[in-house]
């Protein structure tokens, strides 16, 4: 995904997920290869070069998963993805709405009256987290601030928004921002 700027494996969620996956795979007598890809088409080419039992895909979009499924015969699992039509796709994901709801409820119970949620987009899983947060916190009392994905434009955006920091006591990051 473009937000990783070529540093996908430095993302804490992805690296910790790979660590857990590799432990499980190895405990079952298999091994794991890791291949970064900027475009989903690269996965098809890579998969055709090896005799693989299966593949785990992270970080692409719904249309990419659908295209992959139509071009690949080996089983594959989407890890924490957003699949609108999961036919023949196994999607291992968390309940993003409920996770957001729990965080929102927790902040409300702590007595906070306003919250600023920060994300680099307002679609898919991040949208679900924000919607859950609003439902748990208080509808209309949370604002979503969408920041640029790329590092330099993001820093410029932050500098331009510094005057707003006093408006909010808590900053709830919907996603891990890679700075």
Segments from the language model and where they lie:
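Bacterial carbohydrate/catabolite-sensing allosteric modules
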Residues: 2-3, 15-31, 41-45, 53-56, ...
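N-terminal helix-turn-helix/winged-helix DNA-binding helices
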Residues: 1-10
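A conserved, positively charged/aromatic
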Residues: 49
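Short gly/ser/thr-rich secondary-structure transition/capping motifs
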Residues: 36-39, 59-60
């Amino acid at each position: 995904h473009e937000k990783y700027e070529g540093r996908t494996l430095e993302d804490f969620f992805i690296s910790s997920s790979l660590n857990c996956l590799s432990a499980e795979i190895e405990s079952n007598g298999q091994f794991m290869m890791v291949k970064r890809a900027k475009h989903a088409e690269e996965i098809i080419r890579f998969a055709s070069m090896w005799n693989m039992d299966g593949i785990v895909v992270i970080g692409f979009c719904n249309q990419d998963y659908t295209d992959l499924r139509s071009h690949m015969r080996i089983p594959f699992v989407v890890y924490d993805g957003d699949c609108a039509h999961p036919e023949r796709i196994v999607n291992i994901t968390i309940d993003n709405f409920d996770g957001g709801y729990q965080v929102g409820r927790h902040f409300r119970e702590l007595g906070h009256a306003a919250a600023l949620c920060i994300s680099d987009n307002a679609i898919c899983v991040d949208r679900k987290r924000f919607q859950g947060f609003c439902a748990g916190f208080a509808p209309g009392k949370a604002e979503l601030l969408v920041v640029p994905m790329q590092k330099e434009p993001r820093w410029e955006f932050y500098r331009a928004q510094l005057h707003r920091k006093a408006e909010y006591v808590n900053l709830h990051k919907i996603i891990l921002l890679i700075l």
